[in-house]
Design a protein with these regions (language model features):
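Hydrophobic alpha-helical bundles in membrane proteins
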Residues: 85-238
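N-terminal, intrinsically disordered, low-complexity segments
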Residues: 1-64
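Acidic-enriched, low-complexity/disordered segments with a strong bias for Aspartate over Glutamate
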Residues: 22, 29, 37, 58, ...
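Serine/threonine-rich low-complexity intrinsically disordered regions
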Residues: 3, 45, 70-71, 112, ...
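Generic surface-pattern signal
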Residues: 15, 19, 36, 40, ...
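Exposed alpha-helical structural elements
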Residues: 5, 9, 48-49, 73, ...
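Cytosolic juxtamembrane regions of integral membrane proteins
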Residues: 44-107
Length: 238
C-alpha cells in the first residue's frame, strides 16, 4: 500500500522531469501501479521498487537534445506525445476546414460577385469570432495556463492561440473581397481572363489557411478544456 508521503515522493520525482501536468498525472498512476506490483511480486521495499520503476522508465523520460534549433532537451515520451497531439489537431482541422472551403467555392460558382464577397467574409469572420467567443466563455480555465506559467499544464495550451496568427491574412482577404469581389470570384472559379498561378494559389491558400487555423485552434481548445478538468485536482500540489 502506497502512503501519502510515498505518493508525494513519486510526484516530486515526476515534476523534476518537467512533464506537462496532464501527462504527469497519467504517468504518476502508472508509477504507483507498477511500484505496487513490484513490491508485491518481488517482496521489495518501496524505495527498492521505486528505484526499479524509475530505471524501467529512464529511457522514456530522460530528456536529451535531438538536434532541434531551439536547443531544447526533450524525452522520447514527450516527442511521442507531441506527435500524437499534433496529428489529432491536424486531422480535425483538415476534416472540418474542407466543408466551409467547399461552401465558399460553391458560393463563388452560384452567386453574384458582391454576394460572393459578403457571404465569404461572413463565413470567415463568423468562424473566427466563434473561436474568440469560445475562448472568452471559458476564460477562467484558459487563464490557468498563465497562472501556473512555471509549468505546462497540457501541451494543448500551446495551440489555443493559433487563430490569432490569422488576423493579418484575414484583414488582407477582407480588403480584397470588399474592393474587388468580382476579380477574386473569377480567380477562385478559374474564369479569370489571364489567370496567374501564383495569385490563384495565394487566394486559395489565404482563405484555406484562415479556416484551417480556426479549426486547429478549436480542436486545441476542446482538448485543452478536456485535459484541464483532469489537471485541476492536481493544482494544489504545484
Amino acid at each position: 500500500m502506497i502512503t501519502e508521503q510515498q505518493e508525494s515522493e513519486i510526484r516530486n520525482y515526476l515534476l523534476s522531469k518537467k512533464l506537462p501536468i496532464d501527462i504527469l498525472i497519467e504517468v504518476n498512476d502508472h508509477f504507483i501501479s507498477q511500484i505496487s506490483d513490484v513490491q508485491r511480486e518481488e517482496n521489495l521495499s518501496f524505495e527498492e521498487a521505486f528505484e526499479k520503476t524509475k530505471l524501467s522508465w529512464d529511457k522514456e523520460l530522460k530528456p536529451y537534445w535531438r538536434g532541434n534549433l531551439n536547443l531544447e532537451d526533450i524525452s522520447d515520451f514527450m516527442v511521442k506525445t507531441n506527435t500524437e497531439i499534433f496529428r489529432t489537431n491536424l486531422f480535425f482541422a483538415l476534416k472540418y476546414s474542407t466543408i466551409p472551403t467547399l461552401l465558399i467555392f460553391f458560393i463563388a460558382l452560384n452567386f453574384k460577385a458582391e454576394t460572393f464577397g459578403y457571404l465569404t467574409l461572413s463565413i470567415i469572420f463568423g468562424l473566427t469570432f466563434y473561436t474568440l467567443i469560445k475562448y472568452f466563455s471559458n476564460y477562467q480555465d484558459f487563464k490557468l495556463a498563465k497562472k501556473y506559467k512555471k509549468y505546462v499544464l497540457t501541451l494543448h495550451q500551446h495551440s489555443v492561440f493559433i487563430f490569432l496568427i490569422i488576423f493579418s491574412p484575414l484583414l488582407n482577404i477582407y480588403t480584397r473581397l470588399i474592393d474587388n469581389p468580382e476579380k477574386y470570384q473569377k480567380i477562385i472559379t478559374f474564369q479569370s481572363d489571364k489567370p496567374i498561378f501564383i495569385e490563384i494559389v495565394f487566394i486559395f491558400m489565404s482563405i484555406y489557411l484562415i479556416i484551417f487555423g480556426v479549426f486547429y485552434s478549436l480542436s486545441a481548445q476542446k482538448n485543452y478544456l478536456k485535459q484541464i478538468e483532469k489537471v485541476k485536482p492536481f493544482l494544489k500540489y504545484l
